[in-house]
């Protein structure tokens, strides 16, 4: 969680997640080599999510209360950026991470909230939903050249977090990307010459000027994804040129 109110370091948490998965995979492979084993151990990454907003609130709960409002984190926009990056991390490791269940789905540290009078989507719902719908197929070994920054906890962290997923059956390619810079838009180029005949279907962006912006029952669409303008992404001669706004989650879909 972002206890220190340090967004730069908070967004680098996905690098810690990436390093953790790589470390566990390395240990599994080292034991396999030492034992001359043939079985590859795959991973389950269980009960993941951002969780810290409700900690202080829950300390005030009385004991033995019926159906208390417990662990009801209200997620803000920067949480959505991190969840988007965590999903990218899990996709990058899809060769070994075969199951990755989000902790809970409704009310308790969840993307969906309810009350006695309604239900609404939290900020983290959108990268989760869109990645689930369009992040299907074969995860490509996405080589990303990006500037880095020094985070307080995780060392060097990339400004650009990205992965590509190819759906061969539907002749569709989806690019997921997070620009973690808090100050600058990012111009990105991507070599897609192997995807001849593909065209941009849509460029979806999740962004907000206020990193602390939240969705509530009264304002359920304060933070929602929108279609980026045509000037934000173009594909010519097998080269994709795109602009990712500062502190934004992006999804570019291409298809024949």
Please place each PLM-identified region on the residue numbering.
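Flexible loop/turn segments at secondary-structure boundaries
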Residues: 1-7, 49-55, 106-112, 151, ...
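Acidic, Ser/Thr/Pro-rich beta/coil linker or hinge segments at domain junctions
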Residues: 196-240
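Beta-strand-rich interaction surfaces with strong enrichment in secreted/lumenal proteins
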Residues: 177, 239-242
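Noncatalytic carbohydrate-binding groove/subsite architecture in carbohydrate-active enzymes
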Residues: 1-87, 93, 144-158
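Short Pro-Gly-centered flexible turn/kink motifs
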Residues: 243-254
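Carbohydrate-binding surface patches
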Residues: 157-197, 203-208, 250-251
């Amino acid at each position: 969680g972002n206890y220190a109110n340090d967004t730069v370091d908070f967004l680098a948490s996905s690098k810690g997640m990436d390093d953790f998965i790589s470390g566990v995979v390395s240990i599994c492979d080292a034991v396999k080599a030492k034992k001359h084993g043939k079985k590859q151990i795959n991973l389950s990454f269980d009960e993941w999510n951002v969780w810290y907003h409700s900690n202080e609130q829950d300390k005030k709960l009385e004991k033995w209360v019926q159906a208390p409002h417990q662990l009801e984190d209200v997620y803000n926009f920067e949480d959505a950026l991190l969840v988007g990056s965590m999903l990218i991390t899990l996709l990058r490791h899809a060769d070994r991470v075969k199951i990755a269940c989000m902790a809970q789905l409704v009310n308790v540290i969840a993307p969906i909230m309810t009350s006695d009078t309604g239900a609404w989507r939290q900020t983290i719902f959108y990268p989760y939903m869109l990645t689930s719908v369009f992040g299907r197929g074969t995860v490509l070994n996405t080589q990303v050249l990006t500037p880095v920054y020094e985070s307080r906890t995780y060392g060097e962290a990339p400004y650009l977090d990205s992965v590509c997923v190819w759906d061969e059956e539907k002749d569709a390619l989806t690019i997921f990307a997070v620009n973690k810079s808090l100050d600058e838009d990012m111009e990105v180029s991507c070599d897609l010459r192997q995807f001849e005949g593909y065209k941009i279907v849509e460029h979806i962006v999740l962004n907000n000027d206020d990193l602390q912006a939240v969705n509530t029952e009264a304002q359920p669409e304060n933070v929602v994804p929108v279609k980026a303008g045509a000037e934000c992404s173009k594909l010519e001669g097998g080269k994709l040129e795109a602009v990712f706004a500062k502190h934004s989650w992006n999804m570019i879909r291409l298809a024949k």
